[in-house]
C-alpha cells in the first residue's frame, strides 16, 4: 500500500474557502503548499499528488479558478522535501510528448528520482476552447485513449533514448558530449 496526500487548495468543498480557519489563497500560496508537503513527508506519506484540469465552469470549485499547475509547484516542492514522491496530473489531449517528457525528466532530476505522472485525457469538451479549438474538435473517449497510449509510448521512448552515463563531461580530455 502506498499512502498519498493531495494538496487541493482549501479542499474539495465548494464553500471550504469560507471557513474561518481557511487560508483563502491556499491554491496559489507557496508557503501553504510547502507546509503541507513537509507535514506529509514527516508523516511518512509515500507521495504528494497535485491534480489539475484544463477547463472550469460555473460548477467548478471557486479556488480551481486560480491554482498552480503541477510541474512548477512540484519542482519548487522538490527543493523543500527529500523523500516524498511528487506526482502531478498532465493531460495527453492538449500537450505534446516531447515537451511533457522534458518537463517530467527535469522534475525527476531535480527531485532525485521522485517524479510521477498522473496521466489524464481531459474528458471535458470545454477544454478545447482553451487551446484555440472548437468544441467539436475535442476528441471522443476512444480517440483520447488511443492518443494517450501512443503518447505514453513516445514519452517512454524519449526517456529511454540514452543511458544515464551517455553524456561525457571529461575535463582532463576536454570532451564534453
Description of each model-found segment:
Residues 1-81:
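N-terminal beta1-alpha1-beta2 module of alpha/beta enzyme domains
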Residues 3-5, 48-50, 84-90, 113-119:
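Hydrophobic faces of well-ordered beta-strands that scaffold small-molecule active sites
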Residues 13, 57, 94-96, 125:
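Generic structural signal for helix capping and beta-alpha/helix-loop junctions
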Residues 15-31, 89-98, 136-142:
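Active-site mouth loops of central-metabolism enzymes
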Residues 96-177:
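Internal, glycine-rich beta/alpha segment that forms the wall or movable "lid"
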Amino acid at each position: 500500500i502506498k499512502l498519498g496526500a493531495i494538496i487541493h487548495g482549501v479542499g474539495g468543498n465548494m464553500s471550504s474557502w469560507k471557513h474561518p480557519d481557511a487560508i483563502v489563497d491556499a491554491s496559489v500560496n507557496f508557503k501553504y503548499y510547502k507546509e503541507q508537503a513537509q507535514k506529509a513527508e514527516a508523516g511518512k506519506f509515500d507521495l504528494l499528488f497535485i491534480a489539475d484540469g484544463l477547463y472550469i465552469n460555473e460548477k467548478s470549485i471557486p479556488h480551481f479558478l486560480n491554482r498552480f499547475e503541477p510541474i512548477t509547484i512540484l519542482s519548487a516542492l522538490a527543493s523543500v522535501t527529500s523523500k516524498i514522491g511528487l506526482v502531478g496530473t498532465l493531460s495527453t489531449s492538449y500537450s505534446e510528448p516531447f515537451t511533457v517528457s522534458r518537463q517530467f525528466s527535469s522534475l525527476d532530476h531535480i527531485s532525485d528520482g521522485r517524479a510521477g505522472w498522473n496521466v489524464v485525457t481531459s474528458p471535458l469538451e470545454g477544454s478545447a476552447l482553451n487551446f484555440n479549438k472548437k468544441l467539436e474538435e475535442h476528441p471522443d473517449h476512444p480517440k483520447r485513449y488511443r492518443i494517450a497510449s501512443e503518447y505514453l509510448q513516445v514519452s517512454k521512448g524519449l526517456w529511454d533514448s540514452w543511458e544515464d552515463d551517455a553524456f561525457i563531461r571529461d575535463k582532463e580530455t576536454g570532451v564534453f558530449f
